[in-house]
């Protein structure tokens, strides 16, 4: 630990360090010393472990050795990238004073703070994934949740009542950094995440949030953004804005608005559904064999990020969806998607370049990327000029051209500039007369030095005499020691080497001062011109962001057109009737990884057929069939074409899945508890317009308990909720449900035995399966034959003895728990604080009649 109580006991340099560290106590401080960034004390110990760098000790301060670790200044980006991946933050401290005029340590300042959620440096970001920072707040009644993408300026807020929704939002947005108040009572939902930041309560104060946001947007109030009444969400947004301002230490002109996300505008998916459908991450945590991997052939990183946002937030607005479908169809019919893709590949990641421009951290090569993008826009306009499709024209208009800015960048910036402005050589020759003159003076040194060298050779008669330069001693005349007796008296010795002597003369010293002054002046002028370039671009930021947004959307639509043509997808029909009708549907991911042809299957769900009881052997394809239905419905709700011969899809508000489970050891929940929690979420939140996938409910407990729960869940979904439901089960007793209730049907996936082998047909057929083929699957898995034979004998015994096999059990009547009285059910559903006196009186009379 650092003791700063007696700071005067420390050396002046360590006093400076400790003062800066006190301003940034919770993050690693990289302190510039010469060609290294140094870390001291606890920071050094922590960095040595995280970055695998040496921990040493240097001298003493306040009587104690100083633990120290360091990294070369030119390699800092690689170390920062590693820290960001680990969820850590860093403060970069640079020398800002002039060593020549400084008394004591050179003045240093923290010039930037890098955190996982606010990083904008290209080298520290994954280019095809959003990098979000989020804040969560709970006011005792509801949650407020805000997200910001500093790389694009997108700023969203949301508020909701349920913990399940918080989990779903965290799964959907996957923030790199999450801010939460000190009193946050739901830490169990965020523990284990990287980038957690606990913030003081006052940062979530509503009045402060309103003031901060109004200052940022230059408005009197927040009414125009439609967020004024969302007070809990605004508390989270205020903390978010304050944190970003504190870390960036500059204006944020690209953050121009905040939007309230409306749950009723989206097809809602909980965390389990996103995980089970493997949208952008597979069950093992990777990217391979996900929906995004199959769909994403976008030409630009910003298009790739937009596609993933669409996948994670399917929408219900039929006008927008049909507009996307129509645009995709147009790009296919006019064969435009390939040419568009080729042009857009030259555009690159304009969105993040503009963010760095707004933050004034844009590097010279960012400007060349902008120049390259601007150069493609006229060609893109020509490509789309003759197209009369309304949506295509609107996108073309939004992706406007910027000829003046293109001309400026072509005149101002070198074709291939260096990485950093501090290296010079960024501004093109001919752009500024004063800069050209200074460069001529600095670059003319070679010719002048040759002239001086030839003259001195002639005057001294020393043919081996050389004029040279190094950074330590400047310009010099070098003479071999053997010829040193020939050196004139006005030569002043500057350096003695083993075999040579180095001298200086007045003319060379004056020329050195002149050249070095010209170089310094040229670099200072070049930096000023570069800043002026940024100043010229910044007023166009809003238009540039709008153009980047249109280019990203055009990229996604062209990509979806290419995917539809390449993968044989068809345009789904969005209908108003309660129906899901898919002909020859396919799983978009499984069909790409299979070596054998994929067996396409139909599905029909409608008012009189809202639940399918699905039976069949393990490995028969039940889960694939269920998931493909959900993915086809999801694709239809991002406006994409779908893997099917045809699809008619009615209104959907939510997609739920209860497929597979594992222990949640961190929360102390068993597999069965996880299964029941997910099931409860479905039963409490599904509606008649929800799509529900239920796979093997009840298998984590005893046969009778599991069967009873499965039966009751199926009844609830079918009769009370009326959701579109695919209910896969090994409880063959459930196949009796269609006989007992309306709106249900049996389907099955069959298999055929050939001697000791089994062939799975993968084709969905009407009716219930005749058997499960469990022993055959066990044999395929390599279970020893002796075990299989013993299992066959046991199966025969059970089939002859158990009432389950003979159909004698009526699962709905199995007494698991005491059946509650209707009056108790009614009372449990009552919310007393929400009842008017009249409603309370009516309730009393209603309860009395129920006794």
UniProtKB/Swiss-Prot annotation:
UniProt keyword annotation of Coiled coil present: no
CDD domains the record matches: ABC_MutS1
Gene3D superfamilies reported for this sequence: 1.10.1420.10, 6.10.140.430, DNA repair protein MutS, domain I, MutS, connector domain, P-loop containing nucleotide triphosphate hydrolases
GO molecular function: ATP binding; ATP-dependent DNA damage sensor activity; damaged DNA binding; mismatched DNA binding
A cellular-component GO term for this protein: cytosol
HAMAP family in the cross-refs: MutS
Record-level GO BP terms: mismatch repair
General function of this protein: This protein is involved in the repair of mismatches in DNA. It is possible that it carries out the mismatch recognition step. This protein has a weak ATPase activity.
Family matches, as InterPro entries: DNA_mismatch_repair_MutS, DNA_mismatch_repair_MutS-lik_N, DNA_mismatch_repair_MutS/MSH, DNA_mismatch_repair_MutS_C, DNA_mismatch_repair_MutS_clamp, DNA_mismatch_repair_MutS_core, DNA_mismatch_repair_MutS_N, DNA_mismatch_repair_MutS_sf
Protein origin, superkingdom: Bacteria
Binding site residues for ATP: 616-623
Alphabetic keyword roster: ATP-binding, DNA damage, DNA repair, DNA-binding, Nucleotide-binding
Similarity comment: family membership: Belongs to the DNA mismatch repair MutS family.
Name listed for the protein in its UniProt record: DNA mismatch repair protein MutS
